[in-house]
């Protein structure tokens, strides 16, 4: 009886993901919808496995991977140098794989007459150099900025790739997830926001031009797949070491044709061109 009690006590205090048949996936809010669909479909044919999915942002997922509280980190960005150093210090050997492609779409209200923007204009909008739609050929109305919180991989990617490392304008309203950004733009005729292409409903996309003389490109699956859309990116799973056991079975399934079908059905772009 004492031995049984001791075993139960140990199990109660083990991290949840240590238990057999349980996998946790935590991180990117951009990827939550994808991870939920992948988990649901996988568990239909693997009834002995429980996959728990949560968001919180790429930074939170990476921190959870490093501290051992999640088995799979979903991230819309790579690790920073600082995160890599902490991982090494903690003895975490980060294993990286690309599970899908995505484009960062620029969201506008459906009634906004603006059709396209250059990368330079985007930078100037989000750093407060351009503050009125009339400066872009639109109506004389203020541009209302919406973005993501700084624990978001999308925030980090946008700041690095579009703003060139500059800070966002102080008046940019940070929102906790892509769905919140879409909701804000749908209800603000003067708003502009950014986020993944899988989330856009009730709003419209702006075409993106590399420069004034370039052709505008919309964030379609085809344009993300061939990288003609200027703000295309990879979506990652990070693990501590190469996957084994149940985790490997799940990862192999995600990368299979069955998993890629779920990627497409969820509104994301498969790694392998169709």
Label every PLM stretch briefly:
Residues 14-20:
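Sec/Tat signal peptide C-region and signal peptidase I cleavage site
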